[in-house]
Every structure is written in structure tokens, then in C-alpha cells.
């Protein structure tokens, strides 16, 4: 197993997160999302500017997983909730958690979730939300194993002109 290091991302990591975010999004969804729309989506929502804004926001936090040679292979984002269901003040959202395929199933996703949950608890959050693509059964199984449950609420996720359904899940941290 390749040794990896998990650390808190800093503003200087925006370009690394941008590349990693784009790569993992394309890898995860290229099988059922239109190509041109995916490229445009990555250019907008995985741009260096997008990550610079996120990393500059004190309400947000990010973690990056790297090899010994500092190559980024995974990341997670914690943000205020932007979900289409009722939330309480102080609740937070696990906005993104992705690993490059060769680094999945080695316990690193668990380490990323543990880092996010520890920070959410330190901030006093009682609930941690996330959105998961309704067709992503593997992610749903992973989240269920780690205490998240489907709220029954849905929201649409657009890539270009195509809408996809996300399920809103929550974990009680109290």
C-alpha cells in the first residue's frame, strides 16, 4: 500500500484541488453525463477560482490526501449546508469527498469522513448533511456504513441541460 498523508488544505492548494476535483468528477460521472457539459461543469465548479473562494471562506474547510511525493489523490470539503431541505443553524454539509480510483477501498475515505466529522463537531454542528447522486449505489452504501441516512428529500443537480437527482442524507452528530 502506498503511504498517504491527510492534511488540512490551505489557500495555496487551490490549483491542486482544482485538478483533483476535475479528475475525480470526470472519472466518477463520465459514463452517464454528456461530455461537453461535463467539461463546462468542471471548468466552472472545479476552477482554481472556485477553490480559492472556498479556501478563503472561514465557514468552509477542506482536506487533501497526498502521496509521499505530494501528489494529490483525494479530498473532502465541509461547507454551510446548501441542501433543499430544512436545516438548523450550525448544521454543516459534507460538500465533496472524492478519491482517485487506485486509492479507494483502502480506508482513506473513512479518514476523510472522520476529519470532516471532527471539524463539524468542533464547530458545534449537530447534523452533517450531504447530497449523493441517486444512481451512485456504491457511495450510498459507503455513507450508510458511516451513519448517514436518507432524509427522503431530493434535489436536482444540473450538468449542462441535463438534470440528475441527488438524494439528501444526514448524520446526527449530537
Named regions from a protein language model:
Residues 107:
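Glycine-rich phosphate-binding loop
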Residues 4, 8-14, 18-32, 37-102, ...:
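Acetyl-CoA-dependent GNAT
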Residues 1:
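Short, conserved catalytic or adaptor-binding loops enriched in Gly and charged residues
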Residues 63, 88-92, 126-129, 133-149, ...:
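C-terminal "cap" of GNAT-fold acetyltransferases
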Amino acid at each position: 500500500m502506498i503511504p498517504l498523508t491527510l492534511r488540512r488544505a490551505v489557500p495555496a492548494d487551490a490549483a491542486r484541488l482544482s485538478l483533483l476535483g476535475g479528475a475525480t468528477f470526470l472519472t466518477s460521472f463520465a459514463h452517464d453525463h454528456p461530455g461537453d457539459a461535463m467539461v463546462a461543469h468542471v471548468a466552472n465548479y472545479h476552477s482554481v477560482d472556485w477553490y480559492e473562494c472556498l479556501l478563503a471562506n472561514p465557514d468552509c474547510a477542506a482536506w487533501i490526501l497526498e502521496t509521499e511525493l505530494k501528489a494529490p489523490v483525494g479530498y473532502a470539503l465541509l461547507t454551510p449546508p446548501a441542501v433543499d431541505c430544512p436545516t438548523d443553524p450550525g448544521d454543516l454539509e459534507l460538500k465533496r469527498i472524492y478519491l482517485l480510483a487506485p486509492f479507494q477501498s483502502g480506508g482513506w475515505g473513512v479518514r476523510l469522513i472522520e476529519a470532516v466529522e471532527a471539524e463539524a463537531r468542533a464547530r458545534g454542528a449537530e447534523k452533517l448533511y450531504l447530497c449523493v447522486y441517486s444512481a451512485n449505489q456504491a457511495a450510498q452504501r459507503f455513507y450508510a456504513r458511516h451513519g448517514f441516512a436518507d432524509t427522503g428529500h431530493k434535489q436536482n443537480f444540473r450538468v449542462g441541460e441535463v438534470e440528475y437527482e441527488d438524494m439528501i442524507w444526514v448524520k446526527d452528530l449530537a
